[in-house]
């Protein structure tokens, strides 16, 4: 999106983002502003906390792209993280319809890194996994989760693929698990090029200190960006 916004700005393309939160922490404007700055997003981003934009487009998934022509008509929409070449070709066609000239026929090749890198779907055998009890699946610690209560868990010794567990004292609520005593541990057996974990401090402006082990050792060159 950033590349398209820069490449086609002078040809008349206007990019507007809409952030529709999935979790409660995503409703906070400060969190969204921090993410926008961190990702160096320069086009405007609307915070759609009440899902008005989502519902008006009858949207069904994150992310989604909608291309609107100069007359305000939706001419193309796409769900998911793929087919970027096709989307860009439609952008070019709509700009030409509106009188743009001199557009290159090639599409943008972006070699993004870190959290912006395109997913490797050919080797991604692990789905999005939720820690909160509302959507959690494949919990492998032997203890049964008591909702919204502090309890001590035992980490699974050899979890199956896409199974996970906790160790030490946690309070598992609908959307997250809150560590009660330090240290604690999350164990997850996954198969994917990338693993992203959402962490947040109990108090604002406090850093979250954590250690990542991959197959019991430091990840070394496989260490991610930490953003």
Give residue ranges: language-model regions.
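Non-globular targeting/processing and membrane-anchoring segments
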Residues: 85-227
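Thiol/disulfide oxidoreductase modules built on the thioredoxin-like
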Residues: 37-42, 47-92
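Structural microenvironment flanking redox-active thiols in thiol-disulfide oxidoreductases
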Residues: 1-38, 47-53, 208-210
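Tryptophan-centered motif/residue detector
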Residues: 4, 19, 54, 62, ...
């Amino acid at each position: 999106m950033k590349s398209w916004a820069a490449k086609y700005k002078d040809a008349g393309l206007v990019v507007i983002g809409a952030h529709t939160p999935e979790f409660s922490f995503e409703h906070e404007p400060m969190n969204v502003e921090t993410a926008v700055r961190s990702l160096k997003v320069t086009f405007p981003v609307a915070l759609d906390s009440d899902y008005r934009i989502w519902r008006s487009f009858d949207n069904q998934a994150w992310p989604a792209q909608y291309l609107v022509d100069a007359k305000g008509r939706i001419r193309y929409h796409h769900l998911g993280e793929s087919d970027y070449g096709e989307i860009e070709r439609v952008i070019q066609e709509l700009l030409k319809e509106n009188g743009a000239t001199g557009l290159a026929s090639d599409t943008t090749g972006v070699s993004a890194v870190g959290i912006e890198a395109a997913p490797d779907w050919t080797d991604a055998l692990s789905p999005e996994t939720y820690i909160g009890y509302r959507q959690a699946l494949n919990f492998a610690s032997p203890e049964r989760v008591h909702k919204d209560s502090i309890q001590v868990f035992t980490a699974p010794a050899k979890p199956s693929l896409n199974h996970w567990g906790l160790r030490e004292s946690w309070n598992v609520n609908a959307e997250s698990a809150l560590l009660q005593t330090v240290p604690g541990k999350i164990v997850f057996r996954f198969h994917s090029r990338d693993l992203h974990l959402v962490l947040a401090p109990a108090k604002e402006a406090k850093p979250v200190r954590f250690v990542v082990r991959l197959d019991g050792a430091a990840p070394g060159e496989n260490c991610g960006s930490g953003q």
